[in-house]
Structure formats: structure tokens, C-alpha cells
């Protein structure tokens, strides 16, 4: 398969064609300009059947009706109304004429629209809806439960005969057996991944809790080489359950302003379009569109009952054509609601349809997620009581992943059955029998994970990470490294990890050996959440003073290019035992017993100062105990082989740690106490972007040599690294207490979207500020106190009353993947050997 297509597929999506007897399809254009009209409403009158046009103006849906009235409408154009006979399977070419029409006191024009909120009946209608949006909310009930069936599929889009004849696909002539037809676009598609879920959802108001009991989960497709848990967490985060009554709707890791938001009337234009019957009830067709089509909002329709409840029977959302959103070429969200006997609104059916494209000109990925909800109950059950006693939010039955096909045949809704979709596992078996696909999958696995599996399925051992194989520095010269780790397929409780490295200049072997016992049975990797383990670890390697890359390996080849000489390096040897316990509540703690020996080098000598005498010291030891506390409520991860990345930063993360060592205890040369605390939080500003804030503070309480002091984290590379300083030199400052901040504001194009030229580029603005206020007490300053190691770097300094501050402005979304920041150093600008400003770069792929 095409590398680009597979890359895009890994950005996640979903699909599920529905079957019907007759096809209604065609294209809608502007009668004057002949240009296609995207997002026009296409429906059969007095029914809920229909769709909206895609970005190319085309529409496609199926119906069982042999005769119906087709209505096509879009803001600023005359409606198209015609009796059709779908049984003829005709294709309709509809040219809509622009018009000027009245909505009460509101006048709408096709080109220059003079929209007014004052005295606009649609705006007043929406205000009343917003005021009553919590009425009949299911979340006002004390309890409810429901059954959920969910199907998520990915498919190669527009897999027509022309594409099938290309050399890449001619090798796999059997693919034609699996081609299906999209019920939305009418294009042929090839489903390459399918996921199914059968579960029961539980909700309790007080104390507030939501649980999901998974009875069955099924997965097959080209993404099998990735972590199953990681992919599922990422998909769940990208395609979150949508509540249109919230102020913001979370999709594609972003937040979009809901048409029923408290700020909705300032963000959207609203129009009362028509009155129609939906499920036997007269409903107003309320259309909406953002004032600024590049902003993070929706076009769409809400079909609202004409009574005092303002009940939404059906919702249809899509993205404006010009929205500043990456990789999503088309999105359609459809929700249908029903009422309980007491009027409570219940979500009955939901479909999210997406067309993903990595670049223009590609057919990309067709994706769809369908969710059916049934059997709502408002009386607590024994099963619910059992679920609420479980600590995890998602409870998965032991046999959930191994359900037989008979289970799915019995529980799968009839509408979700598609022979092509449900045979993805058979498709994958045939694909992997071809060497060209087998090796392509292997290469992609290495590129995306950084590791080489030692077997085709359920690998016992991974070799890697490959991006750390070659690196170098001033002390070691060229450095090579090889390593790997075991998996749960070898032993679900016992895990090993390690590497061996060699420097050709210092001719020394370094390495790491780690053995971890997990008290919980793991499915794939040792670091799966939640961790409850005991770990033994020994490491002997170089110590790059003042550099601590928190989000990547120090051996990452992409960090090899430095803005200054990397010569603040010594050696260390460390043995430790760590007990870790993570809880589903988000709280975790870690206890570590550690003995460490730091060794000097010709670059970083240890010279002990006594008056005017400096005595060389080869090394020193510290034996310490450490306690770390962490709380991150509702944190979700994308799981990889070697680490896990949070996929949601909405909830705050609190950390607190303390390290203690006593002189003479287990060979420790010093008494050492070090305390650190931190908080991290993402703040969303609806249409105005979001801000990531990281605050930290720490203190060393005792008299210790400089390797045990607090050295701000200097980033010597030209890449953008969080929680590090792009223009600070390594070991430039020494502190025994500090307070730091890292604030980055992502505007999501809020300003650029208003500049005609820039909004076409879809660039997005970034403003950042990082700083640190530190202090070094006299007892830890070798210039004022004897018995300490002299600072080995001539330019090392202590801070006065002025904090170190650097600020930057940047542009992200350059070619959809690049971020460029220009950074200024605002303080300590006259220090010798420093950069006052500089350009930094990173790869940053985001929706």
C-alpha cells in the first residue's frame, strides 16, 4: 500500500457502509459560477433520510422509498424541490440560483450578507434553547445505564477500477473481492481495518461516576503492528463521545464551539430554514454557520421540536470548507435523539464520517464510526453496583478479546452487517502471504515504533530503539548503542530491558540492565497503565550535566546537531530498586532506594576547595531514598513499546517528590535532602485556542557539591523541547532553590485566519515564555564556602534578583508538519558565550 496512505491511516478514522435498495446521488453547483456547493442539505421531505454535500458538491445516500420529494437547500440560495423516483437510480445535476430572502427582520444575501443578531427570531430561538439546554438532560438523573454497540472502520477511499490497475495493487488482485461502496460518497472503498465494541455504559450522579463494562472487543487490520491499547486510547481520544449540549465539543484532539454554547450567538450565525416532520413531530430546521469559516466551529442543522421543551430530534454537523484543520478533508456528524417517558433526552444513534487526507491530490482514508444505544434504564441494577465498585473506568471482561464470531453474529445490529467489513481478518491473512506487503509492514512498524520485533506475531523480544543506535559527544566521540526489551508474550509478569553502548574516543563500554516484576498481568508491555511493579536497575553511562531531555532519549540521533560544544560530561554508575503503584483514580506513588557514584572526567574535574588549595577527587557516592507522589485524574495514554504519551492534558497533573540521603549511611559521602513540586495544566479558550502551563519549584536543603545542585535544563539542540531553555548554556547557572514556568499559548489560527493571505496557508500562531528564578545560598557557593567542588566551568554564575527569561513567537502547521519558533533571551543578555536569540524547529503533526 502507499506509504502516505498508511501514514494517514495511522492518524485514525472510522467507517461503516449501510445498505439500502435505491441510490440517490448527484452534484450541487452554483448556477452563476458553476462551482460546487459544499455542505448543502440534501433530504427527502418529511423524512429523516438524507445527507449533506461533500467538499466537491456531490451527495449520495440510499433509501427504500420508490418515490419521494427531494429538497436541497443551502444558505443564500433558492431551495430545489422535486419529486423523484429513486428506483430509477438516476444521478441529479442541481444548479442552485443565489437569492435574497427574508427571515423575519433578517435579510440574507448571497455575496455580502448583512447579518444582524438584534431582532433576529433565529437568535432568540437559540437563546431560549441554550437557557433550557439542561432541562431533560440525562445527566440530571440520579442514574442511568444503556447498551452500546460501536463499530469503527478505516478504508482506502475511491478504490475504483483505475486505482486497482496500478502496479502497486495489481500484485494483490484478490483485493477486488473486498471492495465495498460508501453509503455517503458512493465511491468504492476497501476496508483495511475494523473494530467492534459491545459494552454497557453506567452513569451515577452522586458521587459522580461513569463506567463502561466491555463484553466484547474485536480488531483486525493493517494497524495490528501498533499497540492495541495505545491505538484504542488514541481513537477514543480523537473520536470522543459527542455531547452537543456542552459549550465545547471535543474531536480530533481539539475543541470546537458547540452551536448550543453559552458563547454561541457571538460565534455563529443562525437561520430558521423550514418546518418538517421528523418521527411524527413537527420540527424547526435551525441552520448555523460560524462568522469566521476558518475558526474551530461547525456548519449544520438542528431539528428542534416546536414546543416549550426545545427538544433536538436530530443534529447534523460538518466542518466549514475553509476550516483551519489538518488532514480532515470532510467530516459529517449525525445524531438522533428520542425521549424517555418523562421527557429525558436519550441519544439513540450516532454516526461520524470522515475523509482524511495527508496531502492534496490523494484519495486518502475514508473513516466511519457508528454507535447504537439501546435499553436505557434509570433504576440501579446489581450489575451497575458491581461496576461502580471497580477502580477502573473501563472494565473489560477477561474473554472480551476472544469472543467467537457467533457472539458477534448474535449481538451485532443488522444495520452494521457488511460482508466486506467483517472479513478484514481474512483480507490481512491474504495480504501477509505476499512478501512485498509483509516487508512493507515490517519497515513501517520500525518507523512508527522505533523497534524491530523478533517474530511475526506476539514477539517475545524487541530490538531498539533504532533512533538511538548512533550518536556522539565530546567525551565519547562517535557512540554506538544496541539494546532491546522483552514483552508480555514471553512472560506477562517478568520483563527485562537493557542496552550496551561504546564510545570510540574514550574506549569505554556503558550499559543498562533492568529487571521488572509486575504484580499485574500485562497484555503487551511492562509500562501499561496501571503499573504495579518492583524494578531492579543498574546503569553505567555518561552524565551530561545541565541537560535532561524529558521527552526523548539523550542518544536520539535528531539531537546530534548542537548549537554549542557539548563538553559538560562526566560518568556515573547507579544501582536502584523501585516500587511503583498506580491507581485508576490517577494517584500514584514511587519508592526508590538508590546508590550512585559520580565520576569526574577531563572535561568535568572534581576539585575540592579548602582555602586556596584544590584537591582532585576521582568520584563521590550518594546512597538515597526517594518518594514520588503524582496525581493526574482521568489521564489517558497512547502506549508505545518504550514509553507512553498522555493524549489528554485537560486535567491538572500534580507532582511532589523528596530525596533523602545520610552521610555514612550505606557508603554515602554526603547528607542530601532535595524536594520538588510541580503542576501542569492545559487551559482551553474555546474559539481562541489553548494554553499549556507547567510550574515547578524545588530546593536542596543541605551543603552538597555542585553535581547535586539544581542545574536548569539547557537545550543545546536546534529542536524545540518542552521544559528546557533554548538559549541557556549547560551549567550556566547553579541553584539550590528555584521556581520555574513554561507557558505556551497555541492560538489555533485565531489571528492568521483574519489575514487574507495567511489564512490560505492555514498557519497557526504560537506565543511562549519560559523562565526560572533561582538562588544559590552561601553554603553551596564554593567561592564563599570551603569543602565544596569548584565549579568546573568558568562562566557558571549565580542568579541575582532577576530571573532568567526567554520568550518566543512561532508558527506551526507549516506544510502541516513543521513548527518554527524564534526565541529571544530577555535577561542575562551580557553573559559571555551566550546566544541572545535563535530559530528553533520541530516536527509537530496535529489536527
Residue ranges and their predicted role:
Residues 1-27, 42, 101-110, 526, ...:
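Bacterial Sec-dependent N-terminal signal peptides
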Residues 44-46, 71-82:
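A short, solvent-exposed loop/turn motif at the edges and junctions
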Residues 24-30, 57, 94:
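A short, amphipathic beta-strand motif
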Residues 48-58:
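Short, acidic Ser/Thr/Gly-rich low-complexity loop/linker segments typical of extracellular
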Residues 250, 254-256, 388-847:
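Exposed, low-structure sequence patches enriched in small/polar residues
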Amino acid at each position: 500500500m502507499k506509504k502516505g496512505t498508511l501514514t494517514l491511516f495511522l492518524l485514525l478514522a472510522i467507517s461503516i457502509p449501510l445498505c439500502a435498495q435505491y441510490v440517490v446521488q448527484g452534484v450541487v453547483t452554483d448556477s452563476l459560477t458553476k462551482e460546487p456547493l459544499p455542505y448543502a442539505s440534501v433530504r427527502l421531505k418529511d423524512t429523516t433520510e438524507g445527507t449533506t454535500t461533500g467538499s466537491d458538491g456531490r451527495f449520495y445516500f440510499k433509501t427504500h422509498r420508490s418515490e419521494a420529494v427531494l429538497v436541497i437547500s443551502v444558505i443564500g440560495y433558492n431551495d430545489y424541490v422535486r419529486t423523484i423516483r429513486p428506483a430509477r437510480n438516476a444521478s441529479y445535476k442541481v444548479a442552485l440560483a443565489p437569492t435574497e430572502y427574508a427571515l423575519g427582520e433578517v435579510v440574507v444575501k448571497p455575496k455580502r450578507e448583512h447579518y444582524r443578531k438584534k431582532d433576529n427570531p433565529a437568535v432568540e430561538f437559540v437563546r431560549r434553547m441554550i437557557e433550557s439546554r439542561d432541562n431533560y438532560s440525562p445527566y440530571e438523573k440520579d442514574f442511568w445505564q444503556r447498551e452500546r454497540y460501536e463499530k469503527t472502520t478505516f478504508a482506502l477511499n475511491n478504490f475504483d477500477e483505475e486505482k486497482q490497475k496500478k502496479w502497486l495493487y495489481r500484485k494483490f488482485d484478490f483485493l477486488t473481492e473486498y471492495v465495498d461502496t460508501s453509503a455517503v460518497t458512493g465511491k468504492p472503498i476497501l476496508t483495511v481495518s475494523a473494530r467492534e465494541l459491545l459494552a454497557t455504559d453506567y452513569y451515577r450522579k452522586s458521587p459522580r461516576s461513569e463506567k463502561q463494562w466491555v463484553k466484547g472487543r474485536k480488531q483486525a487490520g493493517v494497524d495490528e503492528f501498533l499497540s492495541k491499547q495505545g491505538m484504542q486510547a488514541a481513537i477514543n481520544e480523537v473520536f470522543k463521545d459527542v455531547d452537543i449540549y456542552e459549550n465545547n465539543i471535543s474531536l480530533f484532539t481539539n475543541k470546537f464551539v458547540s452551536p448550543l454554547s453559552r458563547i454561541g450567538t457571538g460565534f455563529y450565525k443562525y437561520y430558521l430554514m423550514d418546518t418538517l416532520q421528523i418521527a411524527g413531530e413537527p420540527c424547526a430546521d435551525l441552520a448555523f454557520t460560524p462568522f469566521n469559516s476558518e475558526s474551530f466551529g461547525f456548519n449544520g442543522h438542528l431539528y428542534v421540536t416546536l414546543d416549550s421543551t426545545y427538544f433536538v430530534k436530530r443534529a447534523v454537523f460538518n466542518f466549514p470548507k475553509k476550516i483551519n484543520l489538518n488532514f480532515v478533508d470532510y467530516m459529517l456528524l449525525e445524531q438522533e435523539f428520542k425521549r424517555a417517558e418523562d421527557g429525558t433526552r436519550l441519544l439513540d444513534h450516532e454516526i461520524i464520517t470522515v475523509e482524511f487526507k495527508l496531502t492534496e491530490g490523494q484519495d486518502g482514508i475514508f473513516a466511519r464510526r457508528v454507535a447504537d444505544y439501546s435499553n436505557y434504564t434509570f433504576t440501579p441494577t446489581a450489575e451497575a453496583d458491581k461496576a461502580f465498585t471497580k477502580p477502573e473506568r473501563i472494565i473489560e471482561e477477561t474473554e472480551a478479546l476472544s469472543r467467537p464470531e457467533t457472539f458477534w453474529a448474535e449481538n451485532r445490529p443488522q444495520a452494521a452487517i457488511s460482508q466486506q467489513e467483517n472479513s478484514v481478518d481474512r483480507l490481512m491473512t491474504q495480504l501477509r502471504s505476499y512478501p512485498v506487503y509483509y516487508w512493507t509492514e515490517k519497515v513501517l512498524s520500525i518507523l512508527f515504533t522505533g523497534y524491530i520485533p523478533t517474530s511475526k506475531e506476539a514477539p517475545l523480544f524487541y530490538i531498539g530503539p533504532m533512533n538511538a543506535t548512533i550518536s556522539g559527544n565530546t567525551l565519547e566521540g562517535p557512540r554506538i548503542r544496541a539494546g532491546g526489551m522483552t514483552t508480555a508474550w514471553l512472560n506477562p509478569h517478568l520483563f527485562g530491558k537493557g542496552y550496551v553502548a561504546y564510545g570510540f574516543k574514550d574506549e569505554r563500554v556503558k550499559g543498562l540492565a533492568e529487571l521488572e516484576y509486575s504484580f499485574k498481568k500485562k497484555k503487551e508491555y511492562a509500562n501499561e497503565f496501571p503499573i504495579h511493579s518492583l524494578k531492579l536497575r543498574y546503569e553505567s553511562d555518561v552524565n551530561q550535566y545541565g541537560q535532561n531531555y524529558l521527552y526523548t532519549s539523550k542518544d536520539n540521533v535528531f539531537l546530534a546537531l548542537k548549537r554549542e560544544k557539548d563538553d559538560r560530561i562526566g560518568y556515573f554508575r547507579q544501582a536502584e530498586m523501585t516500587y511503583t503503584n498506580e491507581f485508576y483514580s490517577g494517584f500514584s506513588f514511587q519508592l526508590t532506594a538508590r546508590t550512585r557514584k559520580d565520576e569526574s572526567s577531563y572535561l568535568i574535574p572534581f576539585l575540592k576547595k579548602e582555602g586556596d588549595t584544590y584537591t582532585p577527587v576521582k568520584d563521590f557516592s550518594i546512597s538515597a531514598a526517594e518518594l514520588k507522589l503524582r496525581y493526574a485524574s482521568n489521564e489517558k495514554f497512547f502506549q508505545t513499546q518504550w514509553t507512553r504519551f498522555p493524549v489528554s492534558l485537560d486535567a491538572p497533573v500534580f507532582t511532589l517528590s523528596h530525596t533523602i540521603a545520610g552521610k555514612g549511611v550505606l557508603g554515602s559521602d554526603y547528607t542530601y535532602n532535595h524536594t520538588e513540586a510541580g503542576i501542569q495544566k492545559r487551559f482551553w479558550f474555546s474559539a481562541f485556542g489553548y494554553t499549556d502551563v507547567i510550574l515547578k519549584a524545588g530546593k536542596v536543603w543541605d551543603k552538597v557539591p555542585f553535581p547535586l545542585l539544581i542545574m536548569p535544563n539547557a537545550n543545546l539542540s536546534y529542536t524545540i523541547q518542552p521544559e528546557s531553555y533554548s538559549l541557556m548554556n549547560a551549567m550556566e547557572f547553579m541553584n539550590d532553590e528555584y521556581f520555574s514556568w513554561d507557558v505556551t499559548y497555541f492560538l489555533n489560527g485565531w489571528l492568521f485566519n483574519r489575514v487574507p493571505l495567511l489564512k490560505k496557508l492555514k498557519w497557526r500562531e504560537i506565543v511562549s515564555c519560559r523562565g526560572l528564578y533561582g538562588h544559590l545560598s552561601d553554603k553551596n557557593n564554593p567561592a564563599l564556602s570551603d569543602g565544596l567542588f569548584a565549579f568546573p566551568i568558568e562562566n557558571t554564575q549565580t542568579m541575582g534578583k532577576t530571573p532568567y527569561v526567554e520568550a518566543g513567537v512561532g508558527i506551526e502547521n507549516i506544510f502541516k508538519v513543521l513548527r518554527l519558533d524564534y526565541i529571544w533571551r530577555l535577561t542575562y543578555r551580557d553573559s559571555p558565550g551566550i546566544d541572545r536569540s535563535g530559530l528553533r524547529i520541530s516536527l509537530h503533526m496535529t489536527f
